Amino acid sequence: MILFYVFVVLALVSGAMVIRAKNPVHSVLFLILVFCNTSGLLVLLGLDFFAMIFLVVYVGAIAVLFLFVVMMLHIRIEEIHENVLRYLPVGGIIGLIFLLEIFLMVDNDYIPILPTKLSATYLTYTVYAGKIHSWTNLETLGNLLYTTYFFLFLVSSLILLVALIGAIVLTMHKTTKVKRQDVFIQNAIDFQNTIKKVR
């Protein structure tokens, strides 16, 4: 239960910092932290496969895409600070409506706020998974990835590595004052014409 509350508190604080952070890059990093804490909650619930898919899809694809888009757009933070106050009333009204909807959704017979007369007889079920000795989802997936489909797994990893390096190259700021090496030009140089013996 302690880990559950730790993940919940970190997810809520990170979600608030996504909105409150002044730097857009910091907002994306806090969003990644929200996804990681949510994956921790899914692991505690026994949904290990969903936790892994959550990390792969949201953190590995969407959050990294947001990060590179923010880095490439050259967002001016000063303009964002000037326009923050004009959106506060509308944001406050939307937040209050959302909070009211949460209370209306939770306060019912199935999910009461105060469990005084909770009768969970309709929620009882029998778990047959614990009665059969079998592998977990992660063990089965790992066994298939690293034995049967290991070649495809390596190829997909190389493709992701090339895409990551390409995104970093695209977001680099090219200036005239910075000295860089051009490997293609260096390899294409004819050393017989450049190096001469001096007697």
Swiss-Prot record:
It catalyses: a ubiquinone + NADH + 5 H(+)(in) = a ubiquinol + NAD(+) + 4 H(+)(out). It is a multi-pass membrane protein. One of its GO terms (molecular function) is NADH dehydrogenase (ubiquinone) activity. The chain crosses the membrane at residues 1-21, 27-47, 49-69, 87-107, 150-170. GO terms for cellular component: mitochondrial membrane. Its EC number is 7.1.1.2. It is found in: Mitochondrion membrane. Core subunit of the mitochondrial membrane respiratory chain NADH dehydrogenase (Complex I) that is believed to belong to the minimal assembly required for catalysis. Complex I functions in the transfer of electrons from NADH to the respiratory chain. The immediate electron acceptor for the enzyme is believed to be ubiquinone. Belongs to the complex I subunit 6 family. This is NADH-ubiquinone oxidoreductase chain 6. It comes from Marchantia polymorpha (Common liverwort).
